[in-house]
């Protein structure tokens, strides 16, 4: 119905151990370090937006020192690398409790993102010469998805005693988007650009439960104030070569927004497993530049000759028949007198968000998020 669901407290791709984070917001979860989700240590409420993989590259013919500041209006920059030089402060955890009562929420260091929260991070960076060794960035414990964004010709960066080919940050928050997505009872997807700028590029992809792949690319984007409707039958069903088709069309869409070839390929490869191979209906859309600057204001000193910012949104959309499956599964658990919490709560990446939707559809209170 176009409403953003809360409960996005799950991390879909694990980070290496060397990534820095706020206390209680490390890359961990119910099965210990490296599990998916940090909610065990710091309770979070009303997380409707995840900022998953932003990186900042520098391209320079000469070495120089730079100061970089990124704000996050509506959210917390909770994970980063290299170590930051400054930034936001989050509440201190006095009494850690995975499931605090409302009275304990504050002492547990909880953050309610339905109230105003504006994050910020700063780095004092040494941009090294173009011929600096790429080996400087090597670290034990690097994951494949950490390596893929290095697919660029950017300068190696040094912050303190840490080296990397890019500045990395992640966040969680709650704010309105300039676009809405809904699916009507006929399973037609409706996309409306409610913002003041055109969406430069959109790509709709669906992986069905029986692993059929359907997609549609909108290379011309979506003008401000306009909408489009996509009946389920109009999503193109592909054959065994779908990966090449989807990959190439996504790369072309990103190239048209200003990314270099290396950056575009690195971005798609970083996302591939957790986004393009997973079941579900999703829409990729390039955020308009002014909206990007509004949400994530960026200041670099000295000012660069040119700045290119490409932020890609990914919206997971629930079809009515899938929602009905959630409700039916919940009813079965109730009949068997099992926990009222949704079965996938502890393990599925959208388990908490599914709980909220089931609660709305069934009229029952299930759990706090």
Identify the residue ranges that each predicted region occupies:
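Protease-labile, long low-complexity intrinsically disordered regions enriched in Pro/Ser/Thr
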Residues: 1-369
């Amino acid at each position: 119905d176009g409403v953003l669901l809360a409960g996005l407290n799950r991390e879909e791709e694990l980070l290496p151990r060397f990534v820095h984070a706020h206390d209680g917001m490390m890359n961990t979860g119910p099965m210990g370090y490296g599990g998916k989700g940090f909610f065990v240590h710091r309770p979070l409420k009303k997380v409707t937006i995840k900022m998953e993989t932003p990186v900042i590259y520098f391209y320079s013919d000469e070495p120089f020192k730079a100061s970089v500041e990124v704000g996050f209006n509506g959210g917390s920059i909770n994970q980063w690398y290299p170590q930051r030089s400054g930034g936001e402060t989050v509440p201190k955890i006095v009494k850690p409790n995975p499931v605090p009562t409302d009275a304990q929420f504050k002492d547990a260091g909880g953050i309610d993102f339905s109230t105003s929260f504006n994050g910020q991070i700063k780095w004092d960076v040494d941009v090294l010469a173009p011929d600096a060794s790429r080996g400087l960035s090597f670290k034990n414990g690097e994951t494949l998805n950490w390596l893929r964004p290095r697919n660029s010709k950017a300068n190696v960066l040094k912050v303190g005693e840490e080296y990397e080919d890019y500045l990395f940050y992640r966040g969680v928050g709650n704010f309105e988007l300039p676009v809405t997505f809904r699916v009507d009872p006929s399973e037609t997807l409706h996309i409306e650009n409610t913002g003041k700028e055109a969406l430069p590029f959109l790509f709709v992809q669906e992986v069905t439960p029986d692993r059929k792949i359907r997609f549609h690319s909108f290379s011309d984007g979506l003008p401000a104030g306009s909408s489009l409707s996509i009946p389920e039958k109009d999503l193109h069903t592909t054959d065994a070569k779908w990966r090449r088709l989807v990959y190439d069309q996504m790369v072309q869409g990103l190239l048209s927004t200003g990314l270099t070839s290396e950056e575009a390929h690195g971005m798609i490869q970083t996302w591939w497993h957790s986004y393009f191979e997973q079941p579900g209906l999703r829409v990729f859309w390039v955020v308009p530049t002014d909206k990007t600057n509004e949400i994530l204001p960026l200041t670099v000193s000295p000012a660069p000759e040119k700045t290119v910012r490409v932020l890609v949104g990914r919206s997971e959309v629930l079809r009515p028949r899938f929602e009905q499956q959630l409700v039916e599964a919940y009813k079965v658990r109730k009949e068997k007198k099992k926990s009222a919490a949704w079965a996938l709560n502890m393990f599925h990446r959208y388990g908490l968000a599914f709980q909220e939707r089931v609660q709305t559809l069934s009229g029952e209170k299930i759990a706090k998020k």
